[in-house]
Amino acid sequence: MAREVLSGVLVEVLDSQVAAAAAGKKMNEVINAAKNVMGGVHFFVIVDTLKYLVNGGRVPKVAGWAESLLNIKPIIMLKNGEAHSVARARTYLSAVKQIMELSKNRIVKGLPLHVAVIHAAETEKAEELKNRIASSFDCAELMITDFTPVIGAHTGPGVIGLAFYCGE
């Protein structure tokens, strides 16, 4: 849309903000920096309930019914815009331990670690996860933020995520 309205102007859509822009870099340098970061981002999400994903048609009713009956917390990895189920846990704390372990296995030693804890109406759990991350990893950057309303509408309240990348 912006490309159509602003013909003759370079318009590049990015899913993240970039520190390079604040550093006064040229547009192509900002775009390259953002693309480099996006390719290295690891993103794990703990879904509290599949109810909202079932209602939205993203998960079959049978799967949602079985997992809710057993109170299973699915762990989803988002990579390159696609969601993949990577684990399941019986409790929230078990799910947290699993995403911490999954993250630990992907952290590149010697590079700065940038981490975001992302949540939908779970401020307390987000703080607890942030504290656990801070005590387990040497983070160059560690923040808490909210999921967008669009994600919250699909997953419902209670979803919590951990996103990170290693690098400058």
Regions found by a protein language model. Give the residues of each.
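Mixed-charge interfacial surface used for oligomerization/domain docking
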Residues: 4-168
